[in-house]
């Protein structure tokens, strides 16, 4: 497994396995919503009313509708997606409050 995918694969697999609804933002700003049906090194199969094959190089952000626990082979990595994201959100909120 490629080093760059040691976080990506467990995260996507947890979303797929738990059937978590996700919003996928593309680099051109388009927002796609659905559940991850499958994925490989290059694409994600997103299912809603239809199935869409989305190329990973076109994806900017994957946002789960709820926190997802996943395991990573990355030492020191976060085991909870929202755990590391919460800090950034709190810092952003604190900065907004200070203005």
Curated annotation (Swiss-Prot):
Key word Hydrolase present: no
Provide the GO biological process annotations.
Answer: regulation of DNA-templated transcription; regulation of RNA stability; regulation of translation, ncRNA-mediated
Domain Sm positions: 9-68
| CDD domains to which the protein is assigned, alphabetical | Hfq (cd01716)
Q: Repeat: is it a keyword of this entry?
A: no
Annotated GO molecular function terms are: RNA binding
Tell me any Pfam family this protein matches: Hfq
Q: Which UniProt keywords apply?
A: RNA-binding, Stress response
Q: Name one GO cellular component term.
A: cytosol
Bias (Low complexity) occurs at 70-93
Q: Where is this region: Disordered?
A: 64-99
- Summary of subunit composition and partner proteins: Homohexamer.
Q: Family membership, please give it.
A: Belongs to the Hfq family.
Q: What is the protein name stated in its UniProt record?
A: RNA-binding protein Hfq
Query: What organism does the record attribute this protein to?
Result: Pectobacterium atrosepticum (strain SCRI 1043 / ATCC BAA-672)
The primary gene name is hfq
